[in-house]
Amino acid sequence: MSLIGKEVLPFEAKAFKNGEFIDVTNEDLKGQWSVFCFYPADFSFVCPTELEDLQEQYAALKELGVEVYSVSTDTHFVHKGWHDSSEKISKITYAMIGDPSQTISRNFDVLDEETGLADRGTFIIDPDGVIQTVEINAGGIGRDASNLVNKVKAAQYVRQNPGEVCPAKWEEGGETLTPSLDLVGKI
């Protein structure tokens, strides 16, 4: 079942951010754009490369009014341990949510019930708490955060410009389309 267009289900969680443990709920997503980046496990292989890449794009996402949350089924304590022991992860300044109950991973339909780990899933959530994009990758395939920045820009553009759509390879300032009878068969 697709989660696009669905409101994020209620959750409460603990996260590690900037040397502190914080509380995060679905209500924190309201009023701003958010990105949820699920990954299988701390102290693994592809995950630290993805999270470091996401940190490298964090300033660009913040400029767009986006808050970033990474999520795994590890606890917030494990996130702190990983942050304190990994050169790549020590750079992270966005919230690292612990989901040991698997509630959030299940709510976003990324939980692998067999392993108890989250799949690699990325979700862009609008200021109303509604999921606008979903990307799920196989465990061995890392994500590119620069593509994520462009997807956020496209989602924001479409929200601000009802009736327009962003075609493939759209970049900010690029040409958009206005679906109409006139365009049928001409693209």
Swiss-Prot record:
Enzyme nomenclature, EC number: 1.11.1.26
Keyword Nuclease listed: no
Gene3D superfamilies registered for this protein in UniProt: Glutaredoxin
GO molecular-function term, one example from the UniProt record: NADH-dependent peroxiredoxin activity
Catalytic residues (positions): 47 (cysteine sulfenic acid (-soh) intermediate)
Domain (Thioredoxin) ranges: 2-157
GO biological process: cell redox homeostasis; hydrogen peroxide catabolic process; response to oxidative stress
Function recorded in the entry: Thiol-specific peroxidase that catalyzes the reduction of hydrogen peroxide and organic hydroperoxides to water and alcohols, respectively. Plays a role in cell protection against oxidative stress by detoxifying peroxides.
Similarity remark: Belongs to the peroxiredoxin family. AhpC/Prx1 subfamily.
Listed name of the protein: Alkyl hydroperoxide reductase C
Record organism: Bacillus subtilis (strain 168)
